[in-house]
Amino acid sequence: KAASEGNTAWSEGHPLSEAANHLIASMVRKVGGFTFQELNLTIDDIRQIGEAGADLSYDFVNRPAYHHALATADTEFLRLTLRTTLELGVDPASLVHALQNHDELTYELLHWENGHRDDIYSYKAAELTGEQIAASVRSDLIEHLTGTGASYNRRFTTNGIACTTATVVAASLGISDLDTIDDVDLIRRAHLLLAMFNALQPGVFALSGWDLCGMLTLPINDVSELVAGGDTRWINRAAHDLMGINPHAHQSTAGMPRGRSLYGSLPEQLADETSFVRQLQAILKVRAHYGIATSRQLDIPEVSHRGMLVLVHELEGEGRLQLTVLNFANEHIAGSVRSEHLPPGAQVSDMFSGHELAVVDDLHSFAVDMPPLHGMSLLVETPVGDLDPSS
């Protein structure tokens, strides 16, 4: 809403837009359906829409934050956005957590740039306004993901960066020329890390065919006519053959040039246990088996390494927690997980393998050892005899 003040034409937050969205959402609910909205709004406005409008909102708040965490190997801004979302009353279960879509990687950061521009937050060992934080994060994203070191990603007006998830990863890893990529495994590992962040928390998980195939951006000369008007987003919309039906095609039936796929088609990946799709399948199996999508987020605790992120979720059933523990740094981490929600004596096990890893100590913590760009989904169970019968 604040972003629209003083503008001659606007849609996001306009009273007519809000009324129309609420009307559509109400009509869809009456026939047993649900809706989601993808307006880029402040957290406050997302909460307000959730009260009477669309059932779900696209998570434009944490999306640029997790890209920033990967680009800088520092999760401080991501932890700030996650905590602020919870504190302002937006349940992450009501959000659509997405990887790539058809648009740009937004860095408008409306909540900080406009809605709370004068509010003071602790960030990078200083007291900064929301506007200052937005400027800092935007500068980091532009520096790490575009420019001479990553010319395959392009800025899109003042809204964000035209890129694919794979080229966000490539730029974060310092790859300046996509033609020189010879370590697909490292890109795939970081891509899966981002998938784990989005899938291993309450809410809806979304991704695209560009993600599934590991698509790179198109050379800008291949879409010169389309970008002539300034819309650089066409470089991240490469044609791709999801099922491998026509491997010799050079463009789609609509004339969109075919892009380079790092991972291959779905049939190729399903035949390879180490592929992106197979590993994503394992992540989604854990998500479904433990009911993570409908869990309740309790805590985003402080971390022992700036590249770490820990999400604490309460699962259905007494005495069970799920922890999403991620290493956004391209380096090994030997650290600890600590949260007041972790009961001393609780058993910690790996949801993927079932192996027991640790016991929570009296400081509500346990040690973790994480390879670079690695993620874990952990089950924390309190022994039956230790459960409080009055709870």
Question: Which residues are covered by each model-predicted region?
Answer:
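Short, loop-centered acidic/histidine patches that primarily coordinate divalent metals
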Residues: 212, 326-329, 351-353, 373, ...
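Residue-level recognition of short, solvent-exposed, well-ordered loop/turn junctions
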Residues: 208, 343, 369-371
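Beta-strand-rich binding/interaction modules
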Residues: 332-356
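Short amphipathic alpha-helical segments and helix-helix/interface helices
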Residues: 21-25, 195, 336
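C-terminal beta-strand-rich structural cap/linker in extracellular carbohydrate-active enzymes
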Residues: 359-391
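Loop/helix patches that line or flank the sugar-binding groove of alpha-linked glycan CAZymes
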Residues: 89, 95-100, 105-322, 328-335
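Active-site-proximal helices and loops of the catalytic beta/alpha 8
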Residues: 2-99, 105-130, 214-246
